[in-house]
């Protein structure tokens, strides 16, 4: 295990040295494994598998079938996302990391070393080859989405005795991904603060937080948490869920999301990412789920109520892209494997009314043969890989 954690500074790039050469910060105690999953989580999951308890066992069968121990990675030296002077190849990364995650989970739950070796093979291929992430502005999305996913795979594998590549994986994430995460939150690609929608900040925060935990860097973790609480970008909590309504009849809060007037594909993605950031933070002792009177729950209830076919109120929203006077019905009813995590925490752990989140979870399960799938289960394009998924076996409590 590393004796000290590494943090990036802009100065490092400016003077032409590696981020890992910039300076080190002594970490506080960070719990491992402690991103999306903890040891207690895996003990619970193993119990469900042993008991063949439904619907969790249905989720396990789906996950186990997806974990291909013979998977061959397609690592690239340069990942390109977005039209630019490069040829887009980022699908190689999101497909590989989804395969690594499934294999790492199956190893951790079932103990099969072939699955561990497959996940290691994928991680080592990327950490030994990747040098840059380039492309249009979409490169910032790649650094965020695939950064948090890679970090979660590495966090699971860190307990595998056969893996000698943890330091190399950390170096890749700290040297390549984190500087982009930090730069985006500071500069937003040189654009006005409301130019980039909430999901851009949120995936960036998920990556920054997860890389901080993986590398035992409390300063990096704090950077993500502080920005989420007080930042000026659209992914900060008060901006991501920017207006609170009172539901007619129940009186419970419904939080209008920043992307509600854009389309429901992105509006629901925001809550997948909010769930990731909150779950990772909760496992490190910081409860973002309850922040500002359970604001994430209010937003989840609003978004999912609309996406299961119910009407919600809408307040006119204006940003750099124009003015939305009505909620968007584009992609209404979109299917994402994100409801299990949010419902398990708010209803199962907190005992709160999360009825619309539960109905959305059930709608996704009805469309998914009874259990959430994962990367690749919901289409071959990047949107089908934005969330890691498999929530029925990983998060379901009842």
What are the roles of these predicted feature ranges?
Residues 23-190, 202, 229, 251-255, ...:
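Extracellular glycan-targeting catalytic surfaces
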Residues 91, 197-200, 266:
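Residue-level marker of regulatory loop/turn positions in helix-turn-helix DNA-binding domains and
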Residues 179-214, 218:
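Loop-centered beta-sheet repeat module
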Residues 149-150, 207, 273-276:
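Amphipathic alpha-helical segments that form well-ordered structural scaffolds
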Residues 212-321:
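Long, repeat-rich segments with strong aromatic
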Residues 1-26:
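Fungal secretory targeting signals
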Residues 135-139, 195, 242:
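Acidic, Ser/Thr-rich low-complexity linear motifs
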């Amino acid at each position: 295990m590393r004796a000290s954690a590494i943090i990036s500074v802009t100065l490092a790039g400016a003077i032409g040295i590696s981020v890992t050469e910039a300076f080190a910060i002594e970490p506080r105690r960070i719990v491992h494994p402690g991103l999306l999953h903890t040891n207690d989580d895996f003990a619970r999951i193993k119990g469900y598998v042993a008991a063949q308890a439904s619907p969790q066992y249905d989720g396990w069968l789906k996950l186990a079938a997806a974990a291909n121990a013979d998977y061959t990675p397609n690592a690239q030296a340069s990942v390109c996302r977005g039209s630019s002077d490069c040829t887009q190849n980022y699908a190689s990364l999101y497909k590989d990391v989804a395969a690594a995650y499934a294999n790492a989970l199956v190893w951790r739950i079932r103990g099969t070393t072939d699955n561990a070796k497959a996940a290691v093979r994928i991680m080592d291929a990327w950490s030994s080859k990747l040098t840059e992430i380039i492309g249009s502005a979409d490169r910032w999305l790649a650094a965020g989405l695939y950064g948090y996913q890679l970090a979660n795979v590495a966090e699971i594998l860190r307990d595998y005795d056969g893996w000698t590549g943890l330091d190399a994986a950390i170096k890749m994430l700290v040297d390549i991904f984190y500087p982009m995460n930090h730069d985006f939150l500071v500069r937003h690609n040189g654009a006005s603060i409301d130019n980039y929608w909430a999901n851009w900040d949120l995936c960036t925060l998920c990556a920054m937080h997860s890389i901080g935990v993986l590398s035992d860097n409390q300063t990096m973790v704090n950077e993500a948490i502080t920005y989420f609480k007080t930042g000026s970008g659209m992914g900060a909590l008060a901006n991501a869920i920017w207006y609170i309504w009172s539901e007619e009849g129940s009186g419970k809060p419904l939080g209008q999301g920043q992307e509600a007037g854009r389309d429901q594909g992105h509006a629901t993605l925001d809550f997948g990412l909010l769930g990731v950031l909150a779950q990772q933070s909760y496992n490190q002792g910081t409860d973002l789920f309850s922040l500002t009177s359970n604001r994430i729950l209010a937003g989840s209830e609003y978004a999912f109520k609309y996406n299961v076919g119910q009407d919600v109120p809408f307040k006119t929203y204006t940003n750099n892209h124009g003015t939305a006077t009505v909620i968007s019905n584009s992609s209404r009813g979109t299917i994402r494997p994100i409801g299990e995590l949010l419902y398990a925490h708010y209803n199962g752990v907190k005992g709160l009314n999360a009825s619309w989140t539960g109905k959305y979870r059930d709608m996704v399960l009805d469309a998914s043969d009874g259990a959430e799938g994962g990367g690749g289960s919901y289409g071959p394009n990047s949107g089908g890989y934005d969330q890691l998924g498999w929530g029925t076996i990983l998060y379901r409590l009842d």
